[in-house]
Design a protein with these regions (language model features):
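Conserved C-terminal "switch" segment of AAA+ ATPases
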Residues: 5-73, 78, 82-83, 156-164, ...
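Helix N-cap and loop-to-helix transition residues
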Residues: 10, 32, 44, 68, ...
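Intrinsically disordered, low-complexity regions
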Residues: 24, 77, 86-87, 208-209, ...
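Short hydrophobic/aromatic residue motifs in ordered secondary structure
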Residues: 47, 104-105
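Peri-catalytic and regulatory segments of divalent metal-dependent proteins
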Residues: 80-92
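Soluble catalytic regions of large protease machineries
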Residues: 93-100, 106-294
């Protein structure tokens, strides 16, 4: 049978899809579907429909006649990360660890030019995560450069480095971050030809799956020596990113502390407030917060 591939909608397509699904929904004057379209790169048509339906439910539950921009932003977070789990009781030590972990991600993002700006930081559990740092793409991307990938690995490791730097210990909370960092590094080496030692060669097919009738030994098409070099290169990429995180967070320790203290006090931090950590740390929003380097 003939198969037709339908790609993800671009920014114009997303805005048109949003308009279609918003036709019979009352929108407040502050709503900008154009802004929502910009913030939803990677969303499918179904995701966008779900976003508007969730926003309508939020407005109804709040007794509002119109869907506000705040409703749409919360609905977007729900689509991305799942619903908030405010009923979950988080012990103080776990809350503190999560605050520094997420602050670590955010500060590293801020310091790396290729990364998308922070949209929101939260230590309220969502889905299976204890906290989350959301950065939204400013444009649609069809590819990523080596520098972008290297810096994205650093972002993944920012939480783990912050734990070690501030708390003097590490936790299992960074498990998914480490898996993601390792996966990106391995793809750089084996799929994207971004290793100087191994050259512009792909060591994996489009799918790494082992099919029926094909053994694990047959699935690998390179020698033990090359496998060892791949592991060395992956480790080198991840280790370099880790050291970069250490440098960033050591130099930006006061910003790391202020971000974490704000999260402990308020649980959620907007991208605008996070920017003030760097541009206006004496702003009244931080009043009463004493970043104690401990």
């Amino acid at each position: 049978d003939r198969q037709v591939y339908v790609g993800l909608p671009d920014i114009k397509g997303r805005e048109e899809i949003l308009k279609v699904h918003a036709r019979k929904k009352p929108l407040a004057e502050d709503v900008s579907l154009s802004d929502i379209a910009k913030a939803t790169a990677g969303f499918t048509g179904a995701d966008l429909e779900n976003l508007l339906n969730e926003a309508a439910l939020l407005a109804a539950r709040g007794g509002q006649r119109f869907i506000s921009m705040a409703d749409l932003h919360e609905a977007m977070m729900k689509v991305i990360a799942g619903p908030e789990k405010k009923s979950r009781v988080v012990p103080p030590h776990a809350k503190r660890l999560t605050a520094y972990h997420e602050a670590g991600h955010a500060v590293v993002i801020h310091e790396l030019e290729t990364q998308d700006p922070v949209h929101q930081i939260t230590i309220i559990p969502r889905g299976g995560a204890g906290g989350m740092t959301i950065s939204l793409p400013q444009e649609d991307r069809s590819y990523m450069s080596r520098r972008e990938l290297e810096e994205h690995i650093a972002v993944c490791l920012g939480g783990r480095v912050a734990e070690q730097l501030v708390l003097g210990d590490i936790s299992t909370g960074a498990s998914s971050d480490i898996q993601k960092a390792s996966s990106i590094a391995r793809n750089m080496v084996t799929k994207y030809g971004m290793s100087e030692k191994l050259g512009t060669i792909a060591y994996t097919s489009e799918s790494n799956e082992v099919f029926i009738g094909r053994t694990m030994a047959q699935a690998r098409s390179y020698s033990e020596e090359v496998a060892g070099l791949i592991d060395e290169e992956v480790k080198s990429i991840v280790d370099t990113a880790y050291r970069r995180c250490e440098d960033i967070l050591s130099q930006r320790r006061s910003q790391l502390e202020l971000t974490a203290q704000y999260l402990l006090a308020h649980e959620v931090m907007s991208g605008e407030t996070f920017q003030k950590v760097f541009t206006d740390p004496d702003d009244e929003v931080f009043e009463g917060l004493i970043p104690a380097e401990s």
